[in-house]
Regions:
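Outer-membrane beta-barrel "beta-signal"
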Residues: 244-246, 276, 297-310
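Residues that define the transmembrane beta-barrel architecture of outer-membrane proteins
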Residues: 50-54, 83-89, 114-120, 165-171, ...
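Repeated loop/turn-to-beta-strand initiation elements of outer-membrane beta-barrel proteins
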Residues: 64-70, 97-104, 130-135, 143-144, ...
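Extracellular loop and loop/strand-boundary signature of outer-membrane beta-barrel proteins
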Residues: 42-44, 75-79, 107-110, 121, ...
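Transmembrane beta-barrel strands of outer-membrane/channel proteins
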Residues: 40-46, 70-74, 104-108, 135-141, ...
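Cleavable N-terminal export/targeting peptides
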Residues: 1-39, 63-67, 98-99
């Protein structure tokens, strides 16, 4: 049984491949290419700043090679402007052969008129004897609205309604190496080319035109925690990890870093995770970690997911 695939996150794909592709390659019989894609999963994560996210996913095989996925969830950013609580809708599909796999995933986050974000991601993987090399491509379009403080020209400040937009494309590569029978190492790097704009939505309000103001854009868009990292606009990101697998238990450690768009500083995290097959068809995956960002400081976070495959 495979773990869930989270849209827009290449790191989840890498961890999944590192944990389950190697043993699949050593089976005496040859299972369908979409073996392990019939499951339902529920997972959540939270940190000590009250940032939270919950996501449930249903995956179903189609024929012998393809599969489709759908998910719903909710996140809450404790330090985001206005206490943002977007709902999450995800969808995905994939097709796999003996050595190649193609996936397409999309996600949409929305909190009324305050926040909307759409991500589309595709990956093409080459697999051989538990080793994986892949190419990732992404597209993002996000918009956030709220009140921001601007100089009023009289030595003080005033709050005005404003709107920030971020859009652009990204490309990345990822890979996994089966170092020994029990040890896998994996990693990923990505580069995104984003364009951001911030504008005042009420021309009659004091403060003048906001124009291209990255500080205000970051204040509106948020995304400064590991939990809501999927909402952060990262110009560059990288991840490296390793896993050790026993018969029914796998333990992995990861280090992730990224550079926030428009000079927003760095985000970093270290995480220790486990995947435990507790009963036929059932897997639980707890995790703990520590993250930091130049905007949000240090946080401790934890995660837990449960997956049932049949």
């Amino acid at each position: 049984m495979k773990s869930q695939l989270r849209p827009t996150q290449a790191t989840a794909t890498i961890a999944l491949l590192a944990l389950v592709l190697a043993p699949a390659a050593t089976r005496a019989d040859t299972p369908p290419s979409n073996d392990g894609q019939r499951y339902v999963s529920v997972g959540g994560q939270a940190d000590n700043r009250h940032d939270q996210q919950v996501l449930s996913t249903l995956s179903l095989p189609v024929g012998q090679r393809a599969w489709v996925q759908a998910g719903v969830g909710k996140s809450r950013s404790g330090q985001a402007t206005g206490g943002r609580k977007p709902g999450i809708v995800t969808g995905g599909m994939g097709v796999a052969g003996q050595t190649m796999q193609l996936t397409l995933n999309a996600s949409h986050r929305a909190d009324g008129s305050k926040y909307r974000q759409t991500d589309v991601a595709s990956s093409l993987d080459w697999r051989h004897d538990g080793n994986v090399v892949g190419l990732d491509m992404t597209h993002r379009n996000s918009r956030a609205a709220g009140m921001v403080a601007v100089a009023n020209g009289q030595g003080g400040s005033t709050t005005v309604p404003a709107q920030a937009r971020v859009s652009g494309n990204g490309v990345g590569v990822h890979g996994a190496l089966q170092a020994t029978e029990h040890v896998s190492v994996y990693g990923a790097v990505a580069h995104n080319h984003y364009k951001s704009t911030t504008q005042q939505t009420d021309p009659s309000a004091p403060g003048g035109l906001l124009g291209l103001n990255p500080v205000l854009a970051r204040a509106l868009l948020g995304g400064t925690s590991v939990v809501d990292r999927d909402e952060a606009a990262l110009d560059h990101s990288a991840m490296v990890g390793a896993s050790y697998r026993w018969d029914k238990v796998a333990v992995s450690g990861e280090f992730t870093t990224g550079q926030v768009h428009d000079g927003g500083g760095a985000m970093r995290s270290v995480e220790l995770k486990a995947a435990v097959d507790v009963a036929p068809g059932w897997r639980i995956a707890p995790g703990v970690g520590r993250g930091s960002s130049d905007q949000g400081g240090h946080t401790n976070f934890a995660s837990m997911s449960a997956t049932y495959g049949w």
